[in-house]
Structures are given as structure tokens and as C-alpha cells.
Amino acid sequence: MTKTLIIAALLTLTGCFNSDNTDTVLPDDPIETQPIGRIGGFVEDLSGQPLSNVLVSTETEVAYTADDGSYTLENVSPDDNIVIKFTKSGYASNYEVVELIGWETATSNTALMGIGGVATFNSTETSQITLDDVTVDFQANSFIDGVSGNPYTGNVMVEITHVDPTTDELDAAPRDLSAIGSDGSSQLVSYGMVDITLYGIDGEVLTVNPDMPANIKIPITNGSLNEDYQLSVGDTQSTWSFSPERGIWVEESVGTITGDEDGLFFTFEAPHFSWWNCDQGFVPSCASGRVIDFVGFPVRSAEVTCAGGQTTSTVTTDEDGYYVCSVMVGDYVSFTASTFVGGRDWHKTKGAIFMDSEGSSAADCEPIPDIQIDVCRIAGTVNVENYEASLNEDSSETVAADGLSAVFWEPPGDISYCNNPLDSLQVGECWSGTNDEIISNYPESSWPGIPASARSAGLWFEVSNAHGSYRMERTLQGVLPFYAWQTHSDENGDIVTDRPEFNQGDLLAVSAAGDSGAYFGPWAVADIAEIPSQVFFSSNSLTATGGNLLVDYTNASGDDVFFAAAAGDEQVLCRFEEAGAFSVPAHALSSLPAGFGGASVFNLSLELAPGPDGLPIYTQIYSGQSVPLSIE
């Protein structure tokens, strides 16, 4: 797992980066680009084993699953009805539908079912094929090319796969059971499904002439359906086919229920071939809720599957993490939310919950408690330094030492990356040693530095307050992007200092140009954070004489206050309970070499805020003072 920058070991190190191998990328005017996003997920067989080399396709993009069954479709244009097709030799094709809101990664997982049976016959002859308990009667010379519509003559290969909807086989059926009936939208209750695919001798997809339909008989079952829903011999029932273009089940005609000693069957005519379904359509009720991540931020474009005895519905969360799914009143329904982060599937299930609502709109929906997925989606940090430095021990004169930096990264997934790094340093504890030794005290997930997964938020990133706007150009350390305010510049041989101005109580706003290559859209948030109270030493300098160092200070706020010191290569970092004074233990200072160094005292605010595309980011704000430190 990549190491993520969350907090610097010392204030004086925050926002400071090695200038070696660093190139500044000068910004052009931001270019308005259309949003693009990604769709990711996993494909499994019905036993839960990952399927590799599955072709995953939309109208414009294709990808193949890896060995672990994962896939990512890149550069997908947002749409509220993106149909995804999943195809692999030896398996019945499947379809899912997802909504992509903007720049984020939408989630779509699916399962494929092995083909039930394969047969070959001559297109010029009347043929009856029975495979997987399904019987199909084809008329002679009834076949046409599925693309051109031209008549086809030659051998035909047929693949037939039957689905019993009372089993896990339903997971391999297209989308969910949302449908468009003759009287409007419906929620289907299925009794049996079949996928029939026809191929010519050259692998071309075939279908039948609509004027010469095939006759199909499939096994059906009432399962554990309520008596009101059960079918009997002699009943008629609607036929429904799945439309790959529209991504929904469509009512077509009617068929007849027959039966024998082997059970019930559904017989109907098929004027074309795709997935077919024996169903009843009902006006559904609805259930609504929200999906959040480990730190409580809404998860947009998560996949939510609502499944019960009569309910099968899959939907996508909106930009605020909310969803509405179709449910059947009187059903017990489980709600499973999934999101694709860091190349892994993260999910959580809530339920089963009894559906007693009869609402037909989101305002009347059965309320579902938040589904919290244990996934870390923190994607960056903005570091602000509100800082004053005393020039020498004999003067009260101070200079501003404010600073600013930011870095963004791919969300890691594992919740260890969401642990508050400040919790590693206990109240009353001090760390001493070199920079590397102090850093090693933090959990590995919080080590400072630019992470290997760093990504660009655009050509520039800007922080604003009442005093001005501070735009930082994107800079690269090697190939890793970050943003840092350039405090010093060389103008004709003169070193010019230019610092941002921050003061306690300032409200900060942020904005960024966005970067389509990193799937970050243009971003602007007002009042994202407030500068905390600025802590000041009670004296202009400190002297360490070998014993404990008593430090008095003013203007702290909150429960804790931080102290840092540095001399040569040695450093100290402490955390104390806020009481107006603290004592730095002698052992913590013993590693500092004799001579002069520096000490700082500060409030440290580490909060989560909405970042690019709604992902949580840290705002890390230091507010304090530094003074000379004499070590005897």
C-alpha cells in the first residue's frame, strides 16, 4: 500500500520539499472540459470465483477483467443510463446498468453463469432443440443476420441457459427486475428466465425473422411466492425480453402455463432472441437511504442492490450518496452497497428489513438507515501555516512565517489510512530523534511525503481568505504532482520574500482547475476551514540547561497544544494538555546538540472537508510562534 502524506513530523517541515529533480509546470488558462469518469468492479462466477478475460463493454469503451476479476472502464462520459455488457466464451452474457454523475468512479459488479447447453442444426430444416430443460422449435429458413438483417443459410449453433430465479442463478440475469410494461414502469416477479444465443458458421450473431417466430418452452417455479402471486396450469402470463440498448426488461406479448409430472412450464413465441422472462409486473413501492464511508462522507456512484423474496433492484447513489430502489410491499429486503476503491470491492449489507410502506415516490419511501462501508476514501491534504517567528532573543520583533502547500492522491481503501495520525502522539508524550526517527513513530499509513499515488488537481490550486488569493502552480517532484507556495524568489540577484497572509479566525476557501487525466473535476469550496487561535510564547527565547524546560504560553484553544524543537539534525515533538504552561522533560531534549536552535508552540487543527468530487480531504492548519532556543 502506498504511503500517504497526512501530517508532517514538525511544523517547520510542513510544505517543504526537496527541490532536486523538481520542475515547475506553468499554468495556462483553465480549459473547460466535459466531465469524464470511470466504471470499475468485479466479475465472478456463481460460486464466487473471479473470472478473468471477460470482455466488458459500453457503447464507447471496452476493457477486460484481470486475473482477480477486476476491471476499469476509462474515459466514460457521464450518463444516467449506461448499459454495460459482460461477455466471456462459455458463459451467458450479462448486462448491468449504472449511472455516472461526473468525474468519480462508479461501481458495477456482476456474475456470469456457465452456458446450459450447446447444439448445432441446419437452418434450412425445421428443428426442435432441447437443452437445459428448455425446448425450442425453429421454423425452417427463419434465420437472419443479427446485424445486416439479411437471410442466413447454413449451420446454426445455439447456446441455451435457463435461470431458476429462486436460486443464486438470478445473480447472472441482466440488471435487476425493473421493467417497462404496457401500462408503464413495473417491478417484475420472475418465475423463470432463459438466454438463447444463435451463431452462424463464421461466428456472426443470428436471430429469427419476426414473421417466423420460434416457439419456446421453459421450466418455471412458484418458489416461495405468496399464493396471490402463484401461477397454475391454464393461466396466461406476460412475456418480457431484455433490451440491451435500453438496459431494461420490456413487455412483449403473452404465453401459456402448462404442466406435467415434472412441474410447470411456460410456452410462448419469440420473434427475436435475447434474454426472455416469465414474469408478473407490479407497481412497486420504494425504499430510500444513504451510503457513507468510514469517516461518514457520502459515497456517490456506489452500487446498491436491494434483494428480497420478491424484490430485485439495483441502483446507483447520487452525488450526495442517496439512493431510491424499487421494493415489493410485504417483502423482507436486504440492502448491499458496494464501491470500487483502490482496485478492490468494498461493501456492506444492511437488513433484512420488512417493507411495510406503500409509497410510490421518494417522499413516501421506506426509510433505510445509513449503510456505512468500511472504506477509506481520503484523497488529499491542504496544509496551512499561520506562524510568527522571533528574530532574536534580545528583541520582541517578529516576522510572518506563513506557508501553504497541498497534495492529492488516489483514495487508498484500507481503513487504516483513515486513522487520525495525531492519535499516535499521546498527550504528555514527546518524540526525540532525527527526522526519520520521528517519522517512524507515526503509523506507516501516515508517513509524511508525497505518496506514489499522488495525482493532479489541475494546473493550479488556490487558497483564499479576506486578505487575498494564493494560487500555487502545479509542481512535479520527479513525476509526482504537488502544490507549494514559493516563499522566496530570485529577482535579478536579489532574494525576494513573498508569503501568504493568514491570521487566526480567517475563513479559508479553496479552488482548483481540475485535471481530466487524473479524474478530478474543477473544484471550489467556500469556508472549507477556519484558522485556529494563534499560540504565543510568553518570552522571546528559550534556554535549555539540561533539566526540564518550563514553557509558558498564551492564546491557546482546544484541549491540547503542541511543542517542537530542532537543533542540527535532532528534533523534538511533544503534545501537552492545554493549561497555559507545560514542562518538556529533560530526556526529550537530551539529544539536541549544544548551541542554538529553534522552538515552536502551536495549535494544530486536523479536520476533514469535502475535496474534489466530494472525496474527503484533510485540512491541516498550524497556528503558533517560533523563538530561538539556546541549548547549554
Residue ranges and their predicted role:
Residues 37-39, 45-60, 67, 77-79, ...:
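Short, ordered, surface-exposed loop/turn motifs in non-cytosolic proteins
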Residues 13-15:
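C-terminal motif of bacterial Sec signal peptides marking the signal peptidase cleavage site
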Residues 123, 376-502:
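Solvent-exposed N-terminal domain segments of exported/luminal and surface proteins
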Residues 153-162, 166-167, 174, 530-585:
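Short helix-loop boundary/capping segments
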Residues 25-29, 39, 68, 109-131, ...:
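Proteolytic cleavage junctions
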Residues 30-52, 286-301, 382-394, 556:
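Structural motif
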